[in-house]
């Protein structure tokens, strides 16, 4: 009788982590950053229809990198959770920390117990108010949660991008400068990424309940000082 095939738990976890990291590294990166006027999230994304960034609730935004269908399912689940909690209790009870913990529990369970881990990293951003500071939560493929106060970088080549962005980051400057810094950090040694290949959202307190706003291509182009494609 043949002996059953044995893999050490340490090796199994390492293989799963390597598998997830390789899948995430193939995706284009994003940067989320806090500045004195709110939160900006900038993602390299040439698609106009498949969004990597979206609204979760009044003051909460979501960003995902990696396998699109996997992080989009998590986005939808987060919206449902936030809506139900806000309906059952109060809108003020919906916060990024509890949502990040929910994502972390799910990702950790899948990583530990399922055959294939999810090839995703998630950003949950919440605009602060009088009671809470602005927060950025980065959730990794294995359920690890990192609480960032200034900025977070997700996706392929994240360490190098974070190093470039750290040298440019200025929380007291205007939003346009922060957007330019994010574009420069994402571009690296390549030619600057064009406005058409960037997805940009902001969380800003404009005196309304909803703080999420998606910047149109023309707004991004103007902020970056780029010329429209085809113009002389």
Curated annotation (Swiss-Prot):
Domain of life: Bacteria
UniProt subunit comment: The 20S proteasome core is composed of 14 alpha and 14 beta subunits that assemble into four stacked heptameric rings, resulting in a barrel-shaped structure. The two inner rings, each composed of seven catalytic beta subunits, are sandwiched by two outer rings, each composed of seven alpha subunits. The catalytic chamber with the active sites is on the inside of the barrel. Has a gated structure, the ends of the cylinder being occluded by the N-termini of the alpha-subunits. Is capped by the proteasome-associated ATPase, ARC.
Involved pathway(s): Protein degradation; proteasomal Pup-dependent pathway
Subcellular location: Cytoplasm
Regulation: The formation of the proteasomal ATPase ARC-20S proteasome complex, likely via the docking of the C-termini of ARC into the intersubunit pockets in the alpha-rings, may trigger opening of the gate for substrate entry. Interconversion between the open-gate and close-gate conformations leads to a dynamic regulation of the 20S proteasome proteolysis activity.
Family indicated by similarity: Belongs to the peptidase T1A family.
Gene Ontology annotations for the cellular component aspect, listed alphabetically: cytoplasm; proteasome core complex, alpha-subunit complex
Protein name: Proteasome subunit alpha
Gene: prcA
GO MF annotations in UniProt: threonine-type endopeptidase activity
Function: Component of the proteasome core, a large protease complex with broad specificity involved in protein degradation.
SUPFAM superfamilies in the record: N-terminal nucleophile aminohydrolases (Ntn hydrolases) (SSF56235)
InterPro entries: Ntn_hydrolases_N (IPR029055), Proteasome_alpha-type (IPR023332), Proteasome_asu_bac (IPR022296), Proteasome_sua/b (IPR001353)
GO biological process, one term: modification-dependent protein catabolic process
NCBIfam families, per database record: 20S_bact_alpha
UniProt entry keywords in alphabetical sequence: Cytoplasm, Proteasome
């Amino acid at each position: 009788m043949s002996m059953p095939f044995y893999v050490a738990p340490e090796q199994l976890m390492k293989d799963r982590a390597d598998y997830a990291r390789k899948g995430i590294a193939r995706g284009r990166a994003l940067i989320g950053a806090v500045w004195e006027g709110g939160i900006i999230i900038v993602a390299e994304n040439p698609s106009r229809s498949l969004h990597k960034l979206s609204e979760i609730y009044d003051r909460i935004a979501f960003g995902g990198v990696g396998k699109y269908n996997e992080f989009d399912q998590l986005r939808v689940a987060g919206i449902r959770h936030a809506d139900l909690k806000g309906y059952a209790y109060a809108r003020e009870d919906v916060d990024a920390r509890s949502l990040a913990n929910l994502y972390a529990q799910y990702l950790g369970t899948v990583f530990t117990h399922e055959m294939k881990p999810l090839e995703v990293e998630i950003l949950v951003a919440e605009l602060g108010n009088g009671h809470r500071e602005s927060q950025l939560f980065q959730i990794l493929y294995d359920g690890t949660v990192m609480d960032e106060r200034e900025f977070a970088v997700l996706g392929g080549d994240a360490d190098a991008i974070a190093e470039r962005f750290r040298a440019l980051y200025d929380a007291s400057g205007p939003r346009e400068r922060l957007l330019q810094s994010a574009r420069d950090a994402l571009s690296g040694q390549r030619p600057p990424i064009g406005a058409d290949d960037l997805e940009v959202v902001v969380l800003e307190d404009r005196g309304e309940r909803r703080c999420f706003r998606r910047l149109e291509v023309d707004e991004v182009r103007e902020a970056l000082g780029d010329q429209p494609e085809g113009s002389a």
